[in-house]
Amino acid sequence: MKELIIVLMMWIGGHTGFPIPEPPIILEVTPIEIRNLMFGCEELKKQNDPMYDTWCVVDIDPSAIDVIAVYDNKSGIIYLPIYFDKNNMAHKAILLHELVHHLQYKANYDKIVSCMPMLEKQAYNLMDKWIEQNNVTMPAELTVGPLLRLTLTECRMSQPYIPEDDHVVPSAGDNR
């Protein structure tokens, strides 16, 4: 797996100019754990936030979870689903997307962009380029629909980006 990570990071660096950092820690977890990381469920529970019941219910159907993988920029950890297969090209594309975030944060790129969606847009664009270069067909459950992708990648005036407030960078899939 480490060799795959290095190859993908070198590809990203070659297309962005980002320096190649140490590889991130990779943890394989359940889809529910990925969802909990994405929504900050542990923190919501500590704060007795009413959104905990909405986003963090334990009995949710794992197939209804749209988030496939997550990068936590504070810990430098990429969380992949337990079913991740390093030989599957579509799964490699998801890993590449998360590695883009790793390189972005290690290069402090997050400090110069005007909003979080710019990071996401670059990650999706690089993933698309890699998919095209490698002639990969992405299954529907690992893709993001056009409306969700637009929402994730377009900056809005009401959406200032404050780097210290946001440490989990998702890779979403549209399971519907």
Pin down the residues of each PLM region.
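Active-site recognition of the HExxH zinc-binding catalytic motif
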Residues: 93-106
